[in-house]
Amino acid sequence: MRVAVIVFPGSNADVDLFNAVEDVMGVPVDYVWHSDTDLSKYDAILLPGGFSYGDYLRCGAVARFSPVMEQVVKAADEGKLIMGICNGFQILTEVGLLPGALLRNRSLKFRCKLSELRVENNDTSFTRDFAAGEVIQIPIAHGEGNYYCDEETLAKLKANKQIVFRYHGENPNGSLEDIAGICNERGNVLGMMPHPERAVHSWMTSDDGRRMFTSILKTWREQNSVTTHA
């Protein structure tokens, strides 16, 4: 397995994401610049948090036109695993791989804290190592994480079990129905505002994010009939 971490001008969580893949998954991982146009050798593509292009216009609005995004869409259509975290989630909605939009936090303030999430769907490539209904702790760091969609889209998300994570307890940004992360209908594209890559070691206060990366690896191994030996 080989993983790509896309780097846009203004990305700032790319190193954290790269290190999480190396530390937890133990597979080859590369930084891929936003102007690159070939992702064919990668099995999973990760879009990190940050402030791509300074968040001008709105979060992700400029990054969605980066040359690499055409290849990200192609990879998603091919069934490869795509995960967007924070700004990466915003970019995935802007490019149309995920429905809805991320608005300014209801408080109009940047929120940076450890948040509790409830796992709504553990039957995905990204959450299979969690239990359904489990409450986990993952940090957030965003000013525009207020998820919104229209009623028809929300009904589809619920019917198709595309709501993967909800905030548990405090809703830090006013997100519709406490939504913290969603996937596409096919289940190979996930977007979430919290940062699992910042919760992969016990010294990080929480290591609950670790299981997202083990889930991705386990999914790829099963899809490619790869066996491991103790």
UniProtKB/Swiss-Prot annotation:
**Catalytic reaction list:** N(2)-formyl-N(1)-(5-phospho-beta-D-ribosyl)glycinamide + L-glutamine + ATP + H2O = 2-formamido-N(1)-(5-O-phospho-beta-D-ribosyl)acetamidine + L-glutamate + ADP + phosphate + H(+); L-glutamine + H2O = L-glutamate + NH4(+)
Please give the GO cellular component terms listed in this UniProt entry: cytoplasm
Please list the residues that make up the active site: 86, 195, 197
Q: Which domain of life is it from?
A: Bacteria
Q: What pathway annotation does it carry? A: Purine metabolism; IMP biosynthesis via de novo pathway; 5-amino-1-(5-phospho-D-ribosyl)imidazole from N(2)-formyl-N(1)-(5-phospho-D-ribosyl)glycinamide: step 1/2
- One biological process GO term for this chain? 'de novo' IMP biosynthetic process
| Name of the featured protein | Phosphoribosylformylglycinamidine synthase subunit PurQ
Query: Which source organism?
Result: Brevibacillus brevis (strain 47 / JCM 6285 / NBRC 100599)
Classification of source organism: Bacteria, Bacillati, Bacillota, Bacilli, Bacillales
